[in-house]
């Protein structure tokens, strides 16, 4: 698991989402709009895929609302998803052929520039970052 550095964000957005199966599509649409407005279209597909995986995991493993933060730093775009699911720190798995679940964090690990998990007494935060190559704010 790679570790983050914490540069000061240029801007931040936050989204509180209910425990609702439609939340994943709401978060994807929100991130798509934010990245388009910031002229970061070069990372939309990757970020949309990764946020779908992380928010889906939060929905499946928690029964309460989830909070999503989106930050643009000088070097990357970071997404953090907080949920209220207690338990073991999630790790990438190697699912068996034909398994429909268990690939999400492996996809996050493969497609992000950095990612990680922070445990809290009330749940956890899964974060990832993607660097837009050749784009300056």
What spans do the regions from the language model cover?
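Conserved beta-strand-loop-beta-strand hairpin that lines the nucleotide-binding pocket
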Residues: 1-14, 59-137
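STAS-typified acidic loop motif
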Residues: 14-28
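Conserved short strand/loop->alpha-helix "switch" segment adjacent to the catalytic nucleotide/phosphoryl-transfer site
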Residues: 24-52
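Short coil/turn residues that cap or connect secondary-structure elements
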Residues: 19, 35, 39-42, 58, ...
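Hydrophobic packing within well-folded, soluble alpha/beta domains
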Residues: 27, 31, 54, 79-81, ...
